[in-house]
Amino acid sequence: MAPINLNLILAFSLALLGVLIYRTHLMSTLLCLEGMMLSLFILMTLLISHFHMYSMSMAPLILLVFSACEAGVGLALLVKISTSHGNDYVQNLNLLQC
C-alpha cells in the first residue's frame, strides 16, 4: 500500500475517532465529519487516477456535493439548536423535540 493511501486511511480513522470521542459539542462533531469526507474525497480521487477508472471520475465530485449539503444542513441545525437551547451540547438534546 502506498504511503499516501496509508496516511489518508489514518486521517479517516482519526476523524472517526474524533467523532466517537469529542461528541459533546455539535460543532466538533461536524468538523470531524468534514475531515472524514475530505479524506474520502482525496482517497477516492487518488484511487480512480491510479487504477485508470476514468468512467468513475464524477464520483468524487458527487461526494463533494453531498459533503457540502451535509455541512449546510449541519450548520443550519447548529444555529437552530444554539438559538433554542443556548448551547450546542449533544447530550442535552432530544432530536424528536427540535
Swiss-Prot record:
It catalyses: a ubiquinone + NADH + 5 H(+)(in) = a ubiquinol + NAD(+) + 4 H(+)(out). Its EC number is 7.1.1.2. Coiled coil: none annotated. GO terms for biological process: ATP synthesis coupled electron transport. InterPro entries: NADH_UbQ_OxRdtase_chain4L/K, NUOK/Mnh_C1-like. The keyword Transmembrane applies. It is found in: Mitochondrion inner membrane. One of its GO terms (molecular function) is NADH dehydrogenase (ubiquinone) activity. It is a multi-pass membrane protein. Gene3D superfamilies: 1.10.287.3510. The chain crosses the membrane at residues 1-21, 28-48, 59-79. Core subunit of respiratory chain NADH dehydrogenase (Complex I) which is composed of 45 different subunits. Core subunit of the mitochondrial membrane respiratory chain NADH dehydrogenase (Complex I) which catalyzes electron transfer from NADH through the respiratory chain, using ubiquinone as an electron acceptor. Part of the enzyme membrane arm which is embedded in the lipid bilayer and involved in proton translocation. Belongs to the complex I subunit 4L family. This is NADH-ubiquinone oxidoreductase chain 4L.
